[in-house]
């Protein structure tokens, strides 16, 4: 609940919106809105709308066992609620409560316009174990993107500091200096998989850290913004080849993470329709070897 009110900007420190990375100091004035404690819910007969939502979730499943779900989240569906967001994965998971009233829990997030692998814990035990794997960087995530131009060199490591920059209408992550207020270190490995002349490149990305908009900000910083990115890709200065949709071309392609009960979860998501259309139009081969597999672990 506390994380939710911080995310919504309802927690204030000295009159300003607090960030989850802020550290409190003695003498600061903290305002917390009245806590609305949820009463435990129990599983019951689903309504017609609930049954439809359950069918939608079932159609998204890439992997499932007693502890874990991996969903293929479609582009355009938010993971969690926020200002003006009424439909999101966290809310949809209400229909999957078990006989004890336990609802599956999110253990990480994807941006609304990013599609692909979203890991969900079905039990408290799994949630604790999976959250620990992310915290200790035992999880390996691979993303595919279509970017403007061709990065040089074709394989490399991007290491910067990122900080949130807010305006009245929006917020973005900007490149920051070490020591800047709110700045966090972000590291990404990238590899060019295939190119379409010199205009576009299919790039595989492996984030070491998990900062907000990290991959999107890093590719924009390298002058190879992800095609269709509404925050970091300036379409006015770049002409899309015919047939390509101006939508975010970013897929959470694969996740590899230790299973809470031993072994490994390894799930992959297919290209979403708008990216598959672009791959076909550009003659890119989706089954080509992905060189990011050889990127080092940190």
Map each language-model feature to its residues.
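RNA pseudouridine synthases
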Residues: 1-298
